[in-house]
């Protein structure tokens, strides 16, 4: 029988209603009490490194969570992380980079309604997460939600209230869980199967900013982003179009920061199908003039957290580029 560790961090799944609205109050042990049926296929222990609304998550929380998994890694066959849905995709992505090539599954789940409500989605999500964590075919970091297993770098919350809150962006789901039965569609990659042990990382550079272009956007805003961040993710239009000309002044701002150790990544505001800056002149001219990284089919969550990991490891421009384009947990199709 598999031995699974529940790591409770708060979120809606652990919330109760007070005079100021929902807030996390339910303990890890109490969460397990709602799903006694998991004892039929695994044994479960629990820890609770923090109990927060996931809106308040910081890189320090992520490092604490990764450390909890690292410290318990040898003692368990898998891990289930209860988490708020609002930033779950960010946490799943960052764990993919902080704990690479894990043969043991690290499964995030949560709910759109608190676990103590009669019409909640929490109990089935939690049960499914344990089923997936106990499966012989699962590995790496995933989100299990509404019966779908989604790679940690491909998940995005696309609905604020519906139970079917998450989708896998530009990549198939890894598998499904129905009535405790796991159907695995995509096997773990060879890099995971061949790994003797996972690669654990213990640092993040939180100075990564996401800057979204809008018609009328001021170059002064981009300048402030460069001033206050080590990397800027510039979200352009369509396939990665970046406006030129004196009105926007973006070229002059980027020229100003050129050679000052800043990393610039261009992505798209469109959720599906990624960037392709070579199609239109507004993208091609920009990419040819400046040394920028292009995100292609990566999600915002993966771009940002991957940069946090990379910049904590190196500031060498060539090494940053190499690591950025190195696929991790299905984050990039090359």
Could you describe each region identified by the protein language model?
Residues 92-123, 130-136, 257-268:
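Short, acidic/small-residue loops that bind anionic groups at enzyme active sites
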Residues 1-71, 272:
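ATP/NTP phosphate-donor binding region
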Residues 82-104, 244-253:
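Short Gly/Thr/Asp-enriched flexible loops that form oxyanion-binding sites at enzyme active sites
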Residues 108-179:
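Internal gly/pro-rich beta-alpha loop/helix module
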Residues 7-9, 81-83, 107-110, 142-146, ...:
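Short beta-strand segments
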Residues 239-334:
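C-terminal non-catalytic interaction/assembly regions of soluble proteins
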Residues 2, 7-11, 15, 27-38, ...:
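Accessory alpha-helical/coil subdomains and C-terminal extensions
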Residues 17-20, 92-93, 118-121, 151-157, ...:
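Short acidic, glycine/serine/threonine-rich loops at helix termini
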């Amino acid at each position: 029988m598999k031995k699974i560790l529940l790591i409770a961090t708060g979120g809606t799944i652990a919330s109760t209603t007070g005079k100021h609205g929902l807030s996390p109050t339910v303990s890890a042990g109490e969460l397990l009490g709602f799903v006694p049926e998991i004892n039929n296929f695994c044994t479960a222990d629990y820890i609770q490194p923090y109990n927060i609304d996931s809106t308040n998550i910081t890189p320090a929380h992520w490092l604490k969570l990764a450390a909890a998994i690292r410290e318990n890694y040898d003692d368990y066959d898998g891990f289930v992380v209860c988490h708020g849905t609002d930033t779950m995709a960010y946490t799943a992505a960052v764990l993919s980079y902080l704990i690479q090539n894990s043969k043991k599954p690290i499964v995030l789940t949560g709910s759109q309604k608190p676990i103590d409500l009669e019409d909640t989605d929490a109990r089935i999500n939690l049960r499914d997460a344990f089923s997936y964590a106990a499966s012989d075919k699962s590995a790496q970091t995933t989100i299990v939600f509404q019966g779908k297993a989604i790679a940690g770098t491909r998940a995005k919350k696309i609905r604020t209230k519906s139970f079917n809150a998450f989708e896998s962006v530009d990549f198939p789901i890894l598998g499904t869980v129905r009535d405790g039965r796991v159907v695995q569609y995509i096997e773990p990659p060879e890099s995971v199967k061949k790994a003797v042990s996972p690669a654990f990382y213990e640092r993040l550079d939180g100075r990564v900013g996401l800057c979204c272009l809008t018609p009328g956007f001021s170059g002064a805003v981009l300048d402030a982003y460069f001033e206050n961040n080590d990397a800027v993710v510039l979200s352009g239009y369509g396939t990665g179009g970046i406006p030129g000309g004196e009105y926007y002044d973006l070229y002059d701002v980027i020229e100003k920061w050129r050679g000052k150790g800043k990393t610039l990544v261009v992505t798209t505001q469109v959720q599906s199908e990624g960037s392709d800056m070579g199609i239109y002149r507004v993208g091609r001219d920009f990419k040819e003039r400046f040394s920028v990284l292009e995100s292609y089919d990566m999600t915002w969550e993966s771009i940002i957290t991957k940069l946090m990991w990379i910049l904590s490891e190196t500031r060498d421009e060539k090494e940053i580029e190499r690591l950025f384009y190195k696929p991790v947990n299905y984050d990039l199709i090359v």
